[in-house]
């Protein structure tokens, strides 16, 4: 989505409003918004959005399912018992989606959204 395109979803779908149990604000200023993302074993987030591009740093991976428009788009493979290191990836803005943790361990990430 480009800057010229309007964000089509309401602010109420923002992760902090729509999925507060799994998204906690760590810091926000005029340049970034940093979220602590935790999805407990067996939990499913409510549907939500992320309007800004971001860097996602996963330090506690788990087996998850990623859904968009009610359809399963991705299922993470089983992880080794010990997953060394932090996984870092670029994320474009995300429309309505939710994540289900199907693992026996929690999922944890820090998401740095760029303004």
Predicted segments — roles?
Residues 1-19:
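N-terminal low-complexity, Pro/Thr/Ser-rich intrinsically disordered segments
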Residues 3, 39-40, 46-47, 99-104:
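Hydrophobic alpha-helical transmembrane segments of multi-pass integral membrane proteins
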Residues 19-46, 51-57, 109-112:
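A short glycine-rich, His/Asp/Glu-containing loop-to-beta-strand
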Residues 51-71:
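Glycine- and acidic-residue-biased ligand/ion/polar-headgroup-sensing regions
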Residues 71-93:
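Short acidic-glycine-tyrosine-enriched beta hairpin
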Residues 92-115:
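Ligand-binding loop in jelly-roll beta-barrel domains
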């Amino acid at each position: 989505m480009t800057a010229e395109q309007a964000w089509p979803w309401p602010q109420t779908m923002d992760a902090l409003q729509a999925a507060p149990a799994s998204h906690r604000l760590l810091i926000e200023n005029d340049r970034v918004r940093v979220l602590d993302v935790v999805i407990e074993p067996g939990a499913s987030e409510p549907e939500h959005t992320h309007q800004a591009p971001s860097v996602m740093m996963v330090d506690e991976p788990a087996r998850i399912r990623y859904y968009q428009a009610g359809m399963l788009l991705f299922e993470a493979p089983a992880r080794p018992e010990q997953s060394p290191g932090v996984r870092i990836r670029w994320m474009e803005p995300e429309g309505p989606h939710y994540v289900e943790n199907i693992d026996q361990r929690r999922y944890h990430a820090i998401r740095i959204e760029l303004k």
